[in-house]
Amino acid sequence: MQPKNTTHKHQRSLANYCRTGEYTPIPGVKEKNVGRYRQLIFNNVKGSLESAYPLTHNVLAQEEWEELTQEFFSSHKCQSPMVWQMPKELYEYVLETNYKLADKYPFLIDLLLFEWKEVEVYMMEDIEPYPFTEKRINDAGLVLNPEIQVLSLEYPVHLKNAKDITKKDKGHYFVSLHRESETGRILFTNMHYPHVQVIEKLAQEPVNFEELLKIFLQYAPEQEAREALQQFINASLNSKLLLGQAIINSSSIN
């Protein structure tokens, strides 16, 4: 039996070879055989990333995607033992290394973030919402779906085909991603800043229509503000971004 420290040394050598392709002889291991093992592991990594980033995989040229995933696999030491979190580390790798493709594809960071957040929201633990009813209750606060994230983006990766996005599209964009509890589907909602303010307020506690209206009145006359807020609420109830109205006590739904 080999000493424990020797075994660990060989394990590190094997792990380093799997990442970099630089082979250090390991007793009892043939390089041609371990090469197949490395390819198998890399294919699993690449497959996981392609599954998480279908839009990014589609917009990059095949050789660009191969080079990106190979460089990530070779030079980045993943911190999480959970495979589903690996795509987050690819996003962070591109962000932190100022990866060269970001010059050719200025929207790349936003696209990676958008696709990763879809995975993250899908995989997040269940969050118990504030007690609510779908019945209409006068003056009751609206209840936000707690399984949500709101992103601030520079490019409209949620609105346009990535291949059609140019530097002229750069601006300020907001999008929310939420999970529908019945189906587990991830739905996204394009937003403007007043919508984001509404979501931020509802994230703290249920708030009624008249209180939320104060936000919209900062941007539009009263009639226009009322109509815009009501339209947003109706659409959000339909998509389950909003779940209903808060139940304060049992008499609220009688």
Regions flagged by a language model, labelled:
Residues 148-204:
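Low-complexity, glycine/alanine/valine/leucine- and proline-rich hydrophobic stretches
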Residues 14, 141-144, 150, 176, ...:
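Generic preference for hydrophobic/aromatic residues in regular secondary structure cores
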Residues 118-165:
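A glycine-rich beta-turn/hairpin centered on an aromatic-Pro dipeptide
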Residues 1-133, 189-254:
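Long, charge-rich, low-complexity alpha-helical segments
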